[in-house]
């Protein structure tokens, strides 16, 4: 079972002692050589850095907690005001919080200096106290030493300092968001609906690479709220043509929807002339402005209840046009400050952190997808307009940035051969990341004898004629694919609503012995889906396959074939395998592939738990996987219960194969650079603990690889003839491990998929630990081959199958958590802890039924 070609791997290195040990990522073993070379350009721009010292000062601004924008203004005023005494011609740069850097030391020595700065404000000036204290000298010489490999690690504080220098000017010109800068499009707006619009901008970060510092520049886009009157915002959110059609108070459901959208946003008032005070919305009143009262203190000192409408009439001589609409409650909840909608505007420049709707997402993608050559041109334009070499702050520190993208030599790896089954055991060879199943049969097809259909689409839209023809077509395609469906379904009925799912499924399970599959037909987006998965996966342990009504009304061989790919795997079949002779040497001994991911609830949802998922391969192909899943603390990135999860998977692997893995290859998704150290430390120890708990001398070699897709590295073909497809992307299998990668550590970029829309995003792999002493070629080829083992399609996908499956398992668990009385998977109206259920109840909700546990229910 475990035989493979090629040289044997070096034996795993003995693990170092566990206690008090800071794990260091391994050095790069070598550079890859496999594959044909390809000339590329990367959106990295070389920086020329002088070998000087930079002076780092700490600022303390009182009152604290001002937004960064205000802090920047304060510092700007301070530098102007104290020019003669302190700053002279120096141009300090500031990070908006506490850190200030100068190219020449300030004449204050080591002492703390206290200054007073006045900001002219609307109405009255604001006074701030600022203290400056010297922190350290940041040596750029040390950076040069690290980049050339003379120092073991890149000094973080130098990169931070350079980042602040490069961001200082753009931060004052644009709206910063994370590492990107945005501005509203001049002259043309890109509405998304619901009071939101697209803003375009650019990402910028300073990155160490081999021998050079690089500036990574990319175009980016994000959703902002439209600056508009709140009255117009209400119309957009609630789909009114105009406010005139809403002559009566909002209904409860309208108010809830509106509250959900506006809560937390800043508004400015329009009824006080030039004084446009800003407030944050904390709620929307239940009562309209004509009935909403608050305690008003009169001149006589006594307090009377007054309505908001009356107050505006008396105090501001303003008769409200829409007294029947509610008010915004602003500021602190306990303070009872109410503003009628009609005197408020949404403040410009607020980013939308709430989840976009499906329609908004597709509009966003349409507005932002750029073919690779277009994106390349846009990035070059950006560089010209940013013109860093004329930026006075960048020049102050003697930094120069090249205008051209960096040339990089990549390699296009050979795809693996894919082995099918049936009589002819056909072999497919992927071309551009895609292959075809025509005239091929599953490696191991399942025979389906007892199956049912439950149709939740209305009978008048999805008729019995549709169902009959769908069944015939599905049986034909499945027979060709080597997964014969014998006979008609044993049950075929219509049903309505999520409430009928459980009784119907119970009836099916009790009535039809040996029932293998329920095909469920859904009318578009519906809560029925979550309920089908909850009942099928967690309550009764039944295999379910959902199909959209439109794919039943009009079948195509492609959709039916894709359906078969999923069904065969859910029932325990194997669609195809990597050709055994073509696999890398790691397969010579038993090896388990683990994929892990943590998904977090959407931003703005303060209570829902995060979900951690780990999957493990269960055969030598590797094709079949088993899943484990846990709920954990909200937004917790480290997998808390990893030791127990890995232990479960190792036991399951042994049950399936009768082997103990001698190697564990762990692909970890969803970790950002800042968390590498933490995650590695906790999770590597957890994997080791899982092994030792099984047998005290069991020490398989562990390789820990972080997979990242959320980065801004983009690669472009230098030669137009190399471009692939309509969007002109790099070919599938393109790998880069020089020039733009880490100066000393083991990382690489691999674009394993064929880009269909927009510009391909290569995945970034960073090896944080490697007992198995992989060479670059071997790990890159292994990773690329695993991208071809994803069962849902006959294409190579953008990350290795185990990492992808972990993502699917976590995503499915979100559906298991849906509380059908209260919320939908998109986000609940109540922001309670998944509606007040405690940790135990949530943990139970994601627990998969015993019969489902060993199947690939998530496929």
Swiss-Prot record:
GO terms for cellular component: cytoplasm; cytoplasmic ribonucleoprotein granule; cytosol; dendrite; extracellular exosome; glutamatergic synapse; membrane; nucleoplasm. Required for RNA-mediated gene silencing (RNAi) by the RNA-induced silencing complex (RISC). The 'minimal RISC' appears to include AGO2 bound to a short guide RNA such as a microRNA (miRNA) or short interfering RNA (siRNA). These guide RNAs direct RISC to complementary mRNAs that are targets for RISC-mediated gene silencing. The precise mechanism of gene silencing depends on the degree of complementarity between the miRNA or siRNA and its target. Binding of RISC to a perfectly complementary mRNA generally results in silencing due to endonucleolytic cleavage of the mRNA specifically by AGO2. (Microbial infection) Upon Sars-CoV-2 infection, associates with viral miRNA-like small RNA, CoV2-miR-O7a, and may repress mRNAs, such as BATF2, to evade the IFN response. It is linked to Lessel-Kreienkamp syndrome: An autosomal dominant disorder characterized by global developmental delay, intellectual disability of variable degree, and speech and language delay apparent from infancy or early childhood. Behavioral disorders are observed in most patients. Additional variable features include seizures, hypotonia, gait abnormalities, visual and cardiac defects, and non-specific facial dysmorphism. Interacts with DICER1 through its Piwi domain and with TARBP2 during assembly of the RNA-induced silencing complex (RISC). Together, DICER1, AGO2 and TARBP2 constitute the trimeric RISC loading complex (RLC), or micro-RNA (miRNA) loading complex (miRLC). Within the RLC/miRLC, DICER1 and TARBP2 are required to process precursor miRNAs (pre-miRNAs) to mature miRNAs and then load them onto AGO2. AGO2 bound to the mature miRNA constitutes the minimal RISC and may subsequently dissociate from DICER1 and TARBP2. Note however that the term RISC has also been used to describe the trimeric RLC/miRLC. (Microbial infection) Interacts with Epstein-Barr virus (EBV) tegument protein BGLF2; this interaction participates in the regulation of cellular miRNA by the virus, leading to enhanced SUMOylation. It comes from Homo sapiens. It is an enzyme of class 3 (hydrolase). This is Protein argonaute-2. Hydroxylated. 4-hydroxylation appears to enhance protein stability but is not required for miRNA-binding or endonuclease activity. Ubiquitinated on surface-exposed lysines by a SCF-like E3 ubiquitin-protein ligase complex containing ZSWIM8 during target-directed microRNA degradation (TDMD), a process that mediates degradation of microRNAs (miRNAs). Ubiquitination by the SCF-like E3 ubiquitin-protein ligase complex containing ZSWIM8 leads to its subsequent degradation, thereby exposing miRNAs for degradation. ZSWIM8 recognizes and binds AGO2 when it is engaged with a TDMD target. GO terms for biological process: miRNA metabolic process; miRNA processing; miRNA-mediated gene silencing by inhibition of translation; miRNA-mediated gene silencing by mRNA destabilization; negative regulation of amyloid precursor protein biosynthetic process; negative regulation of translational initiation; P-body assembly; positive regulation of angiogenesis. Its main location: cytoplasm. Changing residue 683 to G: No effect on RNA cleavage. Keywords: Cytoplasm, Disease variant, Endonuclease, Host-virus interaction, Hydrolase, Hydroxylation, Intellectual disability, Magnesium, Manganese, Metal-binding, Nitration, Nuclease, Nucleus, Phosphoprotein, Repressor, Ribonucleoprotein, RNA-binding, RNA-mediated gene silencing, Transcription, Transcription regulation, Translation regulation, Ubl conjugation. Residues 587-590, 650-660 are annotated as: Interaction with GW182 family members. Changing residue 669 to A: Abrogates RNA cleavage but does not affect binding to siRNA. Residues 517-818 form the Piwi domain. Changing residue 633 to R: Abrogates RNA cleavage. Binds siRNA. A divalent metal cation binds at residues 597, 669, 807.
């Amino acid at each position: 079972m475990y035989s493979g070609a090629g040289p044997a791997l070096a034996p795993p290195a003995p693990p170092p002692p566990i206690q008090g040990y800071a794990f260091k990522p391994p050095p790069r073993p070598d550079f890859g050589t496999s594959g044909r070379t390809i000339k590329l350009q990367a959106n990295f721009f070389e920086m020329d850095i002088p070998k000087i010292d930079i002076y780092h000062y700490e600022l303390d601004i009182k009152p604290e907690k001002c937004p960064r924008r205000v802090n920047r203004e304060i510092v700007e005023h301070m530098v102007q005001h104290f020019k003669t005494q302190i700053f002279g011609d120096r141009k300090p740069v500031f990070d908006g919080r506490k850190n200030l850097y100068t190219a020449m030391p300030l004449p204050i020595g080591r002492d703390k200096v206290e200054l007073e700065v006045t900001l002219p404000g609307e109405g009255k000036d604001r006074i701030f106290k600022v203290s400056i204290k010297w922190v350290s000298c940041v040596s750029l010489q040390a950076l040069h030493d690290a980049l050339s490999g003379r120092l073991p690690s890149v000094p973080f504080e130098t990169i931070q300092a350079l980042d602040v220098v490069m961001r200082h000017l753009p931060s004052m010109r644009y709206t910063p968001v994370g590492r990107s800068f945005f501005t509203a499009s001049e002259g043309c707006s890109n509405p998304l609906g619901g009071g939101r619009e697209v803003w375009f901008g650019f990402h910028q970060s300073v990155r160490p690479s081999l021998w050079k510092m690089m500036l990574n520049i990319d175009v980016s886009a994000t959703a902002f709220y439209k600056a508009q009157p709140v009255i117009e915002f209400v119309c957009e959110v609630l789909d009114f043509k105009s406010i005139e059609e809403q002559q009566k108070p909002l209904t409860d459901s309208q108010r809830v929807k509106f509250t959900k959208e506006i809560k937390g946003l800043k508004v400015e008032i329009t009824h006080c002339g030039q004084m446009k005070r800003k407030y944050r919305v904390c709620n929307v009143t239940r009562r309209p402005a004509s009935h909403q009262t608050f305690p008003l203190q009169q001149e006589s000192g006594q307090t009377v209840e007054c309505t908001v409408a009356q107050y505006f009439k008396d105090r501001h001589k303003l008769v409200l046009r829409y007294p029947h609409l509610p008010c915004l409650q602003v500021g602190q909840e306990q303070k009872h400050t109410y503003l009628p909608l009609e005197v408020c505007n949404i403040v410009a420049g607020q980013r939308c952190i709430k989840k976009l709707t499906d329609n908004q997402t597709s509009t966003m993608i349409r507005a932002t997808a750029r073919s690779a050559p277009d994106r390349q041109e846009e990035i070059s334009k950006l560089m010209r307009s940013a013109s860093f070499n004329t930026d006075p702050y960048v020049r102050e520190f003697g930094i120069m940035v090249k205008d051209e993208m960096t040339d990089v030599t990549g390699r296009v790896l050979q795809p693996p051969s894919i082995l099918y089954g049936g009589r002819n055991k056909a072999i497919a060879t992927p071309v551009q990341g895609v292959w075809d199943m025509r005239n091929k049969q599953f490696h191991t097809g399942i025979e389906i004898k007892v199956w049912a259909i439950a149709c939740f689409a209305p009978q008048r839209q999805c008729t019995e004629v549709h169902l009959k023809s769908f069944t015939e077509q599905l049986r034909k395609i499945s027979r060709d694919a080597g997964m014969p469906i014998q006979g008609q379904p044993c049950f075929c009925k219509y049903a309505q609503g999520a409430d009928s799912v459980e009784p119907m499924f119970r009836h099916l399970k009790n009535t039809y012995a040996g029932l293998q599959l329920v095909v469920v037909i859904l009318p578009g987006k519906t809560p029925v889906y979550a309920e089908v998965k909850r009942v099928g996966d967690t309550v009764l342990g039944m295999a379910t396959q959902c199909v959209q009504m439109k794919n039943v009304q009009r079948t195509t061989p492609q959709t039916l074939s894709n359906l078969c790919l999923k069904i065969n795997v859910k029932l325990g079949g194997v669609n195809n395998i990597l050709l055994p002779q073509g696999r890398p040497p790691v397969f010579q001994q038993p090896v388990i592939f683990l994929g892990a991911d943590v998904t977090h609830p959407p931003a703005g949802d303060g209570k829902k738990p995060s979900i951690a998922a780990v999957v493990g391969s269960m055969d030598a192909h590797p094709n079949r996987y088993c899943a484990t899943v846990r709920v954990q603390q909200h937004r917790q990135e480290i997998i808390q219960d990893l030791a127990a999860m890995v232990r479960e998977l190792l036991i399951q692997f042994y049950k399936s194969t009768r082997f103990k893995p001698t190697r564990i290859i762990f692909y970890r998704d969803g970790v950002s650079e800042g968390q590498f150290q933490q995650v590695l430390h906790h999770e590597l120890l957890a994997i080791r603990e899982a092994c030792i708990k099984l047998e005290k001398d069991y020490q398989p070699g562990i390789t820990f690889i972080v997979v990242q897709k959320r980065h801004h590295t983009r690669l472009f073909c230098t030669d137009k003839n190399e471009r692939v497809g309509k969007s002109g992307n790099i070919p599938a299998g393109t790998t880069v491990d020089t020039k733009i990668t880490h100066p000393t550590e083991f990382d690489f970029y691999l674009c394993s998929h064929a880009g269909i829309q927009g510009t391909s995003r290569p995945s970034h792999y960073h090896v944080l630990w490697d007992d198995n002493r992989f060479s670059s070629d071997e790990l890159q080829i292994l990773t690329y081959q695993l991208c071809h083992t994803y069962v849902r399609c006959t294409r190579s996908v953008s990350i290795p199958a185990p990492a992808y499956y972990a993502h699917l398992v976590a995503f499915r668990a979100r559906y298991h958590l849906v509380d059908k009385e209260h919320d939908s998977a998109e986000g609940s109206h109540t922001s309670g802890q998944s509606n007040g259920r405690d940790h135990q109840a949530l943990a139970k909700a994601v627990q998969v039924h015993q019969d489902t546990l060993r199947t690939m229910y998530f496929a």
